[in-house]
């Protein structure tokens, strides 16, 4: 009982979280941020009167840095990019010790984070809690951000001023959910120390999970801290990916496995995970930088396979890895084509929103619309896919190599409902 009380005190202390928060409404000036103008007062003006002295270069930069932080809070990547090009500093902080870079880490803004890293973010910069971006991201369960930071070389085991490392915050201040499960696995895969006791609680991450009643996180931590180091990390990685064992994937990566290792069919771990729809495995691999466009000996990639399986969950998992939507399979097709043929309604509904070319013609001379008609069964699933494709702007006039249009194919097959859709 005594240990529970000791452990609970720091949790109450930081119940609001150690990082992030939100934009302050009326911050005081700080050395590198400049003074925020009052409402209605032009930036760089001391009084709000027009005709005041021209702003100094320092004040202009301070105002620009303020606008950059505002853009960061709004996750307005385009505006942030413009400001950075104009000279705004991704490391400039306000009086609450927030910078555009640190905001990206706590809020889980992956594209913004990548922008700030390219713009020279100080990877080990600290917030007001003396915490790194890794600690902030781990606390919020942002596994993808955690993965990018680990790949960028951030200090994996820094202790903030209340005695927590990133792994401690992910468990003690987190939740027993899928996002935190991914975060813990990614920290393990990236080599974070997993058995250190928090100076403030006296607990290891495993003990923290037990105290919080987080059975899922406790199981993960027990698995990754007690597993034997694999003698062949690459073989262990591929086997774990095929089996859907996300904990074993983390252990293999922790042991130094090449994330792009191939099996006898040139399949990577991510391709195996996509093929068998092992989403938790894919989440760890994507966070750690696995390639969504790696071809196997059948000219399949992790992304292309989603069109065959129809897994929307896997599609969503792979999108942050920035897959090439124009990559073609061995038939010269893009992922919407096999999905349309196979009647994967939910997948087609989602993939048409990605910007993929829905009028792409494969080596057989067929578009997704043609395949939905020619290789479909004319039933409700294929009717809905035709409806989705047309609503997304698919060109119903594109004919096959024999000059036969989708409408003519539908009429020849007696698919009256589909023909009616195509006549509209």
Where are these regions (language model features)?
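Ankyrin-repeat inter-repeat connecting loop/turn
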Residues: 90, 123, 156, 194-195, ...
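Ankyrin repeat structural motif
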Residues: 76-84, 109-117, 142-150, 176-189, ...
């Amino acid at each position: 009982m005594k240990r529970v009380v000791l452990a609970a005190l720091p949790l109450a202390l930081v119940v609001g979280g150690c990082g992030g928060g939100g934009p302050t409404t009326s911050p005081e000036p700080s050395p590198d941020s400049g003074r925020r103008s009052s409402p209605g007062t032009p930036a760089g003006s001391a009084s709000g009167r027009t005709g005041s002295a021209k702003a100094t270069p320092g004040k202009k930069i301070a105002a620009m840095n303020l606008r950059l932080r505002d853009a960061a809070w709004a996750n307005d990547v385009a505006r942030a990019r413009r400001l950075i090009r104009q000279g705004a500093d991704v490391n400039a902080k306000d009086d609450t010790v927030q910078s555009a870079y640190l905001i990206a880490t706590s809020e889980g803004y992956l594209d913004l984070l990548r922008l700030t890293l390219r713009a020279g973010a100080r990877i080990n910069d600290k917030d007001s809690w003396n915490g790194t971006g890794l600690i902030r991201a781990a606390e919020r369960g942002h596994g993808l951000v955690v993965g990018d930071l680990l790949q960028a070389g951030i200090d994996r085991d820094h202790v903030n001023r209340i005695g927590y490392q990133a792994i401690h915050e992910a468990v003690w201040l987190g939740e027993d959910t899928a996002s935190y499960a991914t975060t813990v696995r990614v920290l393990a895969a990236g080599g974070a120390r997993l058995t250190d006791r928090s100076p403030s609680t006296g607990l290891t991450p495993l003990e923290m999970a037990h105290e919080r009643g987080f059975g899922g996180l406790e199981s993960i931590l027990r698995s990754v801290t007690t597993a034997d180091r694999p003698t062949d990390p690459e073989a262990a990685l591929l086997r774990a990916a095929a089996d859907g064992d996300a904990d074993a994937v983390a252990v293999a990566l922790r042991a130094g496995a090449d994330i792009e290792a191939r099996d006898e069919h040139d399949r990577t771990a991510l391709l195996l995970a996509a093929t068998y729809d092992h989403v938790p495995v894919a989440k760890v691999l994507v966070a750690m930088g696995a390639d969504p466009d790696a071809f196997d000996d059948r000219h399949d990639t992790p992304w292309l396979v989603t069109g065959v399986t129809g897994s929307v969950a896997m599609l969503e998992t792979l999108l942050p890895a920035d897959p090439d939507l124009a990559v073609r399979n061995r038939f010269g097709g893009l992922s919407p084509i096999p999905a349309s043929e196979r009647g994967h309604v939910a997948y087609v509904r989602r993939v048409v929103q990605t910007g993929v070319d829905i009028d792409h013609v494969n080596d057989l001379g067929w578009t997704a619309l043609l395949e939905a008609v020619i290789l479909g069964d004319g039933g409700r699933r294929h009717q809905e896919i035709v409806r989705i494709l047309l609503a997304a702007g698919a060109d119903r006039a594109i004919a096959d190599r024999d000059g036969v249009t989708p409408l003519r194919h539908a009429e020849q097959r007696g698919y009256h409902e589909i023909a009616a859709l195509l006549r509209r």
